[in-house]
């Protein structure tokens, strides 16, 4: 069965693993998921991510995210929300990029220059599709 929204599936797996205090979570790999994982790592929301080659008998690559917690198991991700969906795409101009929780969170934007955070897109003056909010 095909997946309608692979990005929403990734964010749901991340949210569920975070709520259950899991150390890692795995999902099918794609370039855009790896790009989102790279942004989450650079912004300090996850500890690491790794692309695993398919094992014998498996079909495709997998992406493994290593979650990050504080000293007393405080979650580094308070919330994740998918914004642009297959049924309702959400775009923002460079002048109208969203601020998540007054700048405490990030918005992940798909632009012509690749995946960027809202701050990076504002600095480069590019708009694009608002994929998700993370705070």
UniProtKB/Swiss-Prot annotation:
GO molecular function, one term: structural constituent of ribosome
Lineage top rank: taxon: Bacteria
Swiss-Prot/TrEMBL GO biological process terms: translation
UniProtKB keywords: Ribonucleoprotein, Ribosomal protein, RNA-binding, rRNA-binding
Record keyword Lyase present: no
One GO location term (cellular component): ribonucleoprotein complex
Oligomer status and interactors: Part of the 30S ribosomal subunit. Contacts proteins S5 and S12.
Family annotation (PANTHER family): 40S RIBOSOMAL PROTEIN S15A (PTHR11758)
Function description: One of the primary rRNA binding proteins, it binds directly to 16S rRNA central domain where it helps coordinate assembly of the platform of the 30S subunit.
Family affiliation: Belongs to the universal ribosomal protein uS8 family.
Name of the protein this chain belongs to: Small ribosomal subunit protein uS8
Species per Swiss-Prot/TrEMBL record: Cutibacterium acnes (strain DSM 16379 / KPA171202)
Gene that produces this protein: rpsH
